[in-house]
Amino acid sequence: MPRPEPSPATVADSVTGILDAALVEFERHGLRRVALDDVARRAGVSRTTIYRRFANRDELVAAVIERENVALFADIANELKSAGPQSNYYVEAFTLSILRFRRHHVLNQLIADEPALVMEMLHTHYGAAIERMAAALKVIFPAGFAERIGEQSVNDLADTILRYAGMVLLLPSVEPLDTPEDLRAFATRHFLPSLPASLRTVSA
C-alpha cells in the first residue's frame, strides 16, 4: 500500500525546521564548513528529507538567505517608521540597510566568504529583492508620499538603493564606510545624485 503524501502543513513545518537548523549551523560554523549532514542532524531529519525539499546545498543556502532577507527588510522598514520624521528618508533608508545587513552574522558572512554565490543569487532573485525593498519603502515613507511619486519611482529608488548597497558591501573603497556618519556622507555625495530625476525633484 503506497505511503500517503504528507500534508502541506507537514511539508511547511519540515522546511521551516530545516531552514532554522541551517541558520544555526551557518551562524556557529560558517557557510563553508557546514554540510547537509550537519543540518539534517540538527533538524532531526534524514539527509534524504533535505534532498526532497532542496536540490543541493546551494539551493538550501539560497532559501535561508531569502528568508533572512525578507525578515531584514521588514525590520528595516519598522525601525525607520518608528524612528519618526527623518531629515532625508532616502539617505536614512540607504544607511540603515547597510548597517542592518552588516549586523546580520550570516548575511554579512555570505558577502565575505561566498561573493560568487552572492552574485549568482542576485541574478536569480534581483526582481524579488526590488519588490521587498519597494514594499519596505512604502512603509517608511510619510503617508501619501509613495502615491505622490508613483509606483515606478518607488521601484527605481529600490533598485538604486540595492545597487549602491551592493557597491558598498562587495567592493573595496578608498574612503571609510564603517560608521553611520561615513555611510550618510557616502550617500549624500554619491547615492543622492544618482537618483532618478523624478525623485531628485521631490523631497521625502
Task: Give a label for each model feature.
Residues M1-D13, E175, L195-A204:
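N-terminal intrinsically disordered/low-complexity leader segments
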Residues A63, A77-R103, A158-I161:
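Hydrophobic alpha-helical connector segments
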Residues L99-R103, D159-D178, H190-R200:
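Amphipathic C-terminal alpha-helical segment
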